[in-house]
């Protein structure tokens, strides 16, 4: 079984602010140097985003729900990655995002 290195990154793009001032959240998956990124259909106020933790800093309900969603998505990505490794299937960032139903 070949070991595939995978990294998951959640980030915002300040250059693509929505009309309400919130920044869309993106997910980038990198596997052995290949990367693909996609919007996760969630947004966050600029002042509440923590780039280091890749989470919302807020303590309100919407921030807590957003952080739970991000964590669940990350866990699901790693689960599918592990399943594909066990099956020795071709693993690309695009395939992984399709399996998670983001793309």
Q: Where are the model-predicted features located?
A:
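N-terminal helical hairpins
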Residues: 18-20, 33-103
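Intrinsically disordered, low-complexity boundary segments flanking structured domains
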Residues: 25-26, 99
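Long, polar/Ser/Thr-enriched low-complexity segments
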Residues: 26-29, 53
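Nucleic acid-processing catalytic cores of prokaryotic defense/repair systems
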Residues: 1-11, 28-34, 40-42
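Single-stranded nucleic-acid-binding OB-fold domains
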Residues: 13-23
């Amino acid at each position: 079984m070949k070991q595939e290195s995978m990294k998951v990154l959640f980030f915002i793009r300040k250059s693509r602010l929505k009309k309400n001032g919130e920044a869309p959240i993106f997910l980038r998956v990198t596997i052995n140097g290949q990367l693909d990124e996609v919007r996760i259909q969630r947004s966050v106020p600029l002042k509440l985003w923590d780039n280091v933790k890749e989470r919302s800093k807020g303590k309100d309900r919407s921030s807590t729900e957003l952080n739970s969603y991000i964590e669940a998505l990350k866990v699901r990505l790693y689960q599918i990655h592990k399943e594909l490794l066990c099956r020795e299937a071709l693993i690309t960032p695009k395939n992984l995002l399709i399996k998670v139903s983001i793309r």
